[in-house]
UniProtKB/Swiss-Prot annotation:
NCBIfam families: lnt (TIGR00546), PRK12291.1 (NF008934)
Residues that span the membrane, as ranges: 12-32, 34-54, 60-80, 88-108, 120-140, 142-162
Family label: Belongs to the CN hydrolase family. Apolipoprotein N-acyltransferase subfamily.
Protein function: Catalyzes the phospholipid dependent N-acylation of the N-terminal cysteine of apolipoprotein, the last step in lipoprotein maturation.
Gene name as annotated: lnt
Subcellular location(s) of the protein: Cell inner membrane
Keyword Cell inner membrane annotated: yes
Topology versus the membrane: Multi-pass membrane protein
EC number in record: 2.3.1.269
Source organism of the structure: Helicobacter pylori (strain ATCC 700392 / 26695) (Campylobacter pylori)
GO molecular function list: N-acyltransferase activity
UniProt-recorded name of the protein: Apolipoprotein N-acyltransferase
Chief location: membrane
Pfam families membership: CN_hydrolase
Length: 425
């Protein structure tokens, strides 16, 4: 019997499943910014993820999940390049793939198309080890379809009728279902004037230099240079990426410089904060009125926290995070910043792609700060933007994103209207 792991059909189905993500990654790589190209390709390819999910036989379900896990999340292992455990990189990719192999085996256990419909819609609620980046709904972020569960359910039903029902009347029903899922308001652009005077910084600080103390002076000079440039453009707020200042800012003389400069321009910067023996991944907002601080609430699994039982957690923290007394801790709740009459929620990298940050928030505007140097080059920035766009459309939010080693941008809650800021040379 042929090994399921090397099932060629399962690999092709996995490629169908992730095709919309990879096509957008290619568009990003070649800086193709015409939105209609992305919308057209995504609208055609995103339903293929449903078709692959629908058509995979149960005996290929594990193989499908294995390949999907590897294709979508191989980049998680790339952070090991900056550790003493580089040799574990292939093993980590295989372990990730195995987890999603098991998950897809369960999701596709029954071949009934209506069971597959429910399991597809429910898959975004299942987060292995707290990692919530498998959101198939987000594949439709740049499509002409609405991204709520009901609309995606209609698209899945259309796939059922168009692929399994031979009679013409069922084909007509399938087309009508697709029409019912269209977002007829999607081509209306949202008003982004309120965020038009914000400078989003894209930095290019290599990860292997970021925490090198000998490089700190260059980082400080680059920050000051960006602030002065934003002042010359008469911007009211400048946003830097996650850990743009890579040591505890509260204990640094550099904090006083930022406080002085904030008399003329507000400064939002990602940095670290210590409290006792606790280490926080934080954002600081400097303005002429005050300094506001928000700590990260949702920590990245295996990067900042070990989502494992305590008897495994402690030795693994010691192994991978070292003997340091300091360990990452999270804030108990999200915070919103107020700047004059402008209120927004700051989010740091991983938590910016998590549903809890958006679902119960009164804020209309979100500012996400990321350090994507850990995973460069990879599809991670594209997958991140796909998720952020999904939450922007799903919850009617404006999302601003400042990143290290990837594009910074403003995402509109409508299909059109995004503004991308390419990395500076």
């Amino acid at each position: 019997m042929r090994l399921l792991l090397f099932n060629q059909n399962a690999f092709l189905l996995a490629c169908m499943f992730v095709s919309s993500v990879y096509v957008n990654a290619v568009l990003d790589a070649y800086a193709i910014e015409n939105p209609y190209i992305s919308i057209t390709l995504t609208s055609l390819l995103a339903p293929l993820s449903m078709l692959a999910f629908l058509k995979t036989p149960r005996n290929s379900a594990f193989a499908l999940g294995f390949f999907v896990g590897a294709l979508l999340f191989y980049w998680c292992a790339l952070s090991f390049r900056y550790s003493d455990f580089t040799y574990l990189l292939p093993l980590i990719i295989v372990l990730i793939a195995l987890v999603y192999g098991v998950l897809f085996y369960l999701l596709l256990y029954f071949e009934n198309p209506y069971f597959r419909l429910l399991s597809f819609l429910g898959s975004s609620f299942i987060h292995p080890f707290g990692f919530d980046w498998l959101v198939p709904d987000s594949f439709f972020s740049y499509s002409v379809f609405r991204v709520d569960k009901l609309s995606l359910g209609l698209v899945f039903l259309a796939c059922i009728f168009l692929s399994t029902k031979p009679l013409k009347k069922y084909r007509i029903i399938g087309v009508l279902l697709l029409l019912g899922a269209l977002d007829f308001n999607g081509f209306k652009t949202s008003d982004l004037k309120k965020v038009g005077n914000i400078e989003l910084v894209s930095t290019k600080t290599p990860q292997d230099l970021k925490f090198d103390s000998s490089y700190l002076n260059d980082i400080e000079n680059n920050i000051l240079k960006e602030i002065k440039l934003a002042q010359s453009k008469q911007k009211t707020l400048i946003v830097f990426p996650e850990t743009a200042y890579p040591i505890a800012l509260e204990n640094s003389p550099f904090k006083a410089k930022l406080e002085d400069l904030s008399d003329n321009i507000a400064i939002l910067i990602g940095t670290l904060r210590t409290q006792g023996y606790n280490l926080y991944n934080s954002s600081f907002l400097f303005s002429k009125e005050s300094v506001q601080i928000a700590d990260k609430v949702i920590l990245a699994p295996f990067g900042e926290t070990m989502p494992l039982p305590e008897f495994l957690q402690k030795p693994l923290e010691k192994l991978f995070f070292g003997e340091s007394t300091y360990l990452y801790r999270n804030a108990p709740h999200f915070s919103d910043f107020t700047l004059d009459d402008f209120t927004f929620r700051p989010l740091i990298c991983y938590e910016g792609t998590s549903k809890p940050a958006y679902s119960n928030s009164p804020s209309k505007i979100f500012i996400v700060m990321s350090n994507n140097a850990w995973f460069s080059p990879s599809i991670e920035p594209t997958l991140q933007r796909t998720l952020l766009k999904y939450y922007a459309r799903r919850y009617d939010k404006i999302i601003l994103h400042s990143a290290n080693f990837s594009t910074s941008y403003i995402l509109s809650p409508s299909l059109l209207g995004d503004i991308l800021f390419r990395k500076r040379s």
